[in-house]
């Protein structure tokens, strides 16, 4: 419907409205009917044959996916080293409980895969689980995309279940993980039609800072986004700074599940889109919007 309107095909709107039900009750029903399907507890859309794969987590990328289901599935399966998807690192392509049954050559070859990891982790960021998503993303990148013996970055097509490298060692299937930095850790999104920039940061707690420069409008040059954290006065001082942004700005700040002692910003406070966060936005274009928060 939105695409039809944007492209000027208003007559298509009624076509899609009649073809696909979009009322909230029906959308929720579609998720409820697939939750714990075929007896798989705290799992989404599990198949009859018992082959539990990460595509259950991919569904969390939908803005309609129930957050309470996402939380249950993450707690039950993401950190589960016995039956779930946490192997030598996160995520296994197939749940451990399914591995004894599915042992074909492809099953053994694709023990850990890059694109499935991206879809899985992206869903966690989108659902607002900043702590879990950032920790598991670091775990994946450090183990999948860095070879300790060679002391080099790598981008393999897959790791076998026994952790041997498989396939192309320069695989573009890894390219999606760039978005785990841009859209995950930094939470950057912008709209040219609405002229807005949003930063919903989830910087790993192990990092002191991160900085991004992104092209938005060519004539303006790059927009710089920086997040800093510093232990100070028995607490944590955290800051977001945006420079050279041609749009209105919204900053959604992750409190790392700590108590907010004070905040200082040249923006206006607004509603945050996730738990353990505080958000501010500008009423217009600001030369250097920023947000500083002291946490304990």
Which residues does each predicted region cover?
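Well-ordered alpha-helical scaffold segments within catalytic/enzyme domains
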Residues: 1-10, 57-69, 118-130, 180-189
């Amino acid at each position: 419907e939105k695409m039809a309107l944007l492209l000027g095909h208003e007559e298509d709107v009624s076509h899609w409205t009649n073809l696909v039900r979009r009322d909230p009750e029906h959308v929720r029903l579609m998720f409820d009917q697939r939750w714990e399907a075929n007896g798989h507890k705290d799992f989404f859309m599990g198949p009859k044959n018992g082959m539990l794969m990460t595509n259950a987590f991919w569904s969390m990328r939908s803005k309609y996916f129930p957050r309470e289901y996402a939380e249950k599935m993450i707690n039950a399966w993401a950190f589960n080293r016995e039956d779930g998807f946490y192997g030598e690192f996160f995520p296994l392509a197939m749940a451990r409980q399914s591995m004894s049954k599915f042992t074909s050559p492809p099953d053994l070859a694709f023990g850990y895969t890059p694109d499935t990891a991206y879809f899985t982790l992206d869903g966690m960021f989108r659902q607002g689980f900043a702590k879990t998503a950032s920790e598991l993303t670091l775990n994946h990148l450090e183990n999948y995309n860095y070879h300790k013996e060679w002391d080099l970055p790598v981008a393999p097509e897959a790791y076998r279940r026994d952790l041997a490298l498989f396939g192309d060692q320069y695989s573009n299937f890894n390219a999606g993980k760039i978005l785990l930095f841009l859209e995950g850790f930094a939470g950057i999104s912008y709209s040219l039609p609405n002229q807005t920039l949003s930063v919903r940061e989830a910087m790993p707690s192990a990092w002191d800072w991160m900085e991004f420069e992104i092209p938005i409008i060519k004539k303006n040059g790059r927009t710089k986004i920086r997040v800093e954290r510093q232990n100070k006065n028995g607490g944590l001082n955290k800051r977001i700074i945006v420079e050279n942004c041609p749009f209105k700005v919204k900053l959604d700040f992750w409190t790392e599940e700590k108590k907010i002692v004070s905040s200082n910003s040249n923006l206006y406070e607004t509603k945050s889109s996730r738990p353990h966060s505080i958000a501010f936005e500008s009423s217009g274009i600001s030369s250097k919007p920023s947000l500083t928060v002291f946490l304990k």
